[in-house]
């Protein structure tokens, strides 16, 4: 029984083990499924984040493209406006230059016309003088012609003598050349300086026939050495021949002039050392000393002329610099004067406007006072006429009443009559005095009113004169201001013309800068496009991935922090 119990326990354990293994495998599968679902949800969240990031990047790219397009359009508009303004400035400058050229042409034509008129006037005056004094002019012309002929004769005679002498020398030289050509080939060469040969001092013999003769020199001309003294002047020529020319020289000297004999002797002495004769290298030419000295003097003269021209150029440059400085100073002075004149004109305009307002107020007051005085005079005249008209009818009834009263109350005695007479006389005198006082008062009032009216008219005339003077002054100041403004505009135009190259260079620099900015913006746009393409490619790879490992490997790739990291696909 004891042995059967352990066996049963082992069987139970064996039965329990497969169930536990199944439960463990199920729990592991559940854990794996949960992990895979969590990983899948995480990947889905990352995919959603990547999609959202891609959408935001697309939106940013679209916004940047729109802003870039707007900026490029604004830059292009600004460039077009600047180019149009430059073209307008250039057109204005060209039109101003053309106007100046036409004005200068007109001035030149006017000057030519003035010169022609002056010449015609001078010719007319000469004709008038010749008509007025014909004998004197003819005598003067004859004397002048005689003096001119004498001067020409004095100039021509020495020239003719020189020509004759030169012809004689030329004939002697040609005869000598012919004699030398007729000799047999015995004279090898002719060598001498300007101090020995008279032919070297004669400018008449040309070098061309000498060079032709030197071409027939034979082997002796080829054997000449170049070790002679450079300071010796070569003015002769070389002929072909041998060493035995000394025996034939006495025969050739027969029938020659003394100068030719001297030349022949010099030839005989010069032929002794043929190695000392200097032949110029090809491309060079031997010239006489006189011609060499003449060339040196011409060179010195040209050097002096060049120095004088350089000095004149320096002086002109200095004068131009001074004139530019003076022009700048004058410009500053003109600008200061223009500013002062504008300020003075503003002050004068203010004073003139104030004076005009005061004059207008005074004129209005004078007009009102004139009207009041006119009405007062009219009223006083009417009152005077009314008083005069009232006195006549009032005197008539008073007289009738007095007559009636007198008739009623006539005095009965002489003293009463005398007393009545005195009373009537006093009353009449008082009435006359009152009338005279009233008339005098009216006359005084009329005179005072007339004087006031005259004073007002004089004041009005003086004010009108002051106003006229001030208007003339303002017109003069406005004209001077207009002239100063035109001068200032001309100076500003000159300054703007001088500043046009600088402005053009600035505009070119600005255009280059804008082009660089445009290129950078285009590069940024291309970088955005490449980045969006790379993101789209990565998203497409994620979509085409078959397993989670491929998706994880794609997501674990290096993040796109720089556009240079994007591989071109």
From Swiss-Prot:
Cell location: Cytoplasm; Early endosome; Cytoplasm, Cytoskeleton, Microtubule organizing center, Centrosome; Cytoplasm, Cytoskeleton, Cilium basal body
Coiled-coil residues: 34-187, 289-523
SUPFAM superfamilies given in the database record: G protein-binding domain
Keywords tagged on the record: Acetylation, Cell projection, Cilium biogenesis/degradation, Coiled coil, Cytoplasm, Cytoskeleton, Endocytosis, Endosome, Phosphoprotein, Protein transport, Transport
Upper classification of the organism: Eukaryota, Metazoa, Chordata, Craniata, Vertebrata
PTM annotation (N-acetylalanine): residues: 2
GO cellular component entries: centrosome; ciliary basal body; cytosol; early endosome; Golgi apparatus; intracellular membrane-bounded organelle
Annotated protein name in UniProt: Rab GTPase-binding effector protein 2
Organism, as annotated: Homo sapiens
Stated family: Belongs to the rabaptin family.
Low complexity biased stretches: 245-257, 393-403
């Amino acid at each position: 029984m004891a042995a059967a119990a352990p066996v049963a326990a082992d069987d139970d354990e064996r039965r329990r083990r497969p169930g536990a293994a199944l439960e463990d495998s199920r729990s592991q599968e559940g854990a794996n499924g949960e992990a895979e679902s969590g990983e899948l949800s995480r990947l889905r969240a990352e995919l959603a984040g990547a999609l959202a990031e891609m959408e935001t990047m697309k939106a940013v790219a679209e916004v940047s493209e729109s802003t870039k397009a707007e900026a490029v359009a604004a830059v292009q508009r600004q460039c077009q406006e600047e180019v149009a303004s430059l073209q307008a400035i250039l057109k204005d400058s060209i039109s101003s230059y053309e106007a100046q050229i036409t004005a200068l042409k007109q001035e030149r034509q006017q000057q030519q016309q003035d010169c022609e008129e002056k010449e015609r006037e001078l010719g007319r005056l000469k004709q008038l003088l010749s008509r007025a004094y014909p004998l004197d002019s003819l005598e003067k012309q004859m004397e002048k012609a005689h003096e001119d002929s004498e001067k020409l004769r004095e100039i021509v005679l020495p020239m003719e003598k020189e020509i004759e002498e030169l012809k004689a020398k030329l004939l002697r030289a040609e005869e000598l050349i012919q004699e030398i050509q007729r000799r047999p080939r015995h004279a090898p060469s002719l060598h001498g300086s300007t101090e020995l040969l008279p032919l070297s001092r004669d400018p008449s013999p040309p070098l061309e026939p000498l060079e032709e003769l030197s071409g027939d020199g034979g082997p002796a001309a080829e054997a000449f050495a170049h070790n002679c003294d450079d300071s010796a002047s070569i003015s002769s020529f070389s002929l072909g021949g041998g060493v035995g020319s000394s025996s034939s020289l006495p025969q050739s000297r027969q029938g020659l002039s003394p100068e030719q004999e001297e030349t022949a002797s010099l030839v005989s002495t010069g032929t002794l050392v043929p190695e000392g004769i200097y032949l110029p290298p090809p491309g060079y030419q031997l010239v006489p000393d006189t011609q060499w000295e003449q060339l040196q003097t011409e060179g010195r003269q040209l050097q002096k002329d060049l120095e004088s021209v350089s000095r004149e150029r320096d002086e002109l440059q200095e004068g131009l610099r001074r004139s530019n400085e003076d022009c700048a100073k004058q410009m500053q002075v003109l600008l200061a004067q223009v500013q002062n004149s504008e300020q003075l004109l503003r002050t004068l305009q203010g004073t003139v406007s104030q004076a005009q307002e005061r004059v207008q107020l005074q004129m209005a007051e004078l007009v009102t006072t004139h009207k009041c005085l006119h009405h007062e005079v009219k009223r006083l005249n009417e009152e005077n006429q009314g008083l005069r008209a009232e006195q006549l009818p009032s005197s008539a009834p008073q007289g009738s009443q007095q007559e009636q009263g007198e008739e009623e109350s006539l005095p009965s005695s002489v003293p009463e009559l005398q007393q009545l007479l005195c009373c009537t006389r006093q009353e009449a005198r008082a009435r006359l005095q009152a009338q005279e006082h009233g008339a005098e008062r009216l006359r005084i009032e009329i005179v005072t009113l007339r004087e006031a009216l005259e004073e007002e008219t004089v004041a009005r005339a003086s004010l009108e004169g002051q106003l006229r003077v001030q208007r003339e002054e303002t017109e003069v100041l406005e004209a001077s201001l207009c002239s100063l403004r035109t001068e200032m505009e001309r100076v500003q135009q000159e300054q703007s013309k001088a500043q046009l190259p600088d402005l053009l260079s600035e505009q070119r620099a600005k255009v280059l800068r804008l082009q660089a900015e445009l290129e950078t913006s285009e590069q940024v746009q291309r970088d955005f496009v490449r980045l969006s393409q790379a993101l789209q490619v990565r998203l497409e790879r994620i979509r085409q991935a078959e397993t989670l490992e491929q998706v994880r490997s794609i997501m674990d790739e290096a993040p796109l922090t720089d556009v240079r990291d994007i591989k071109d696909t």
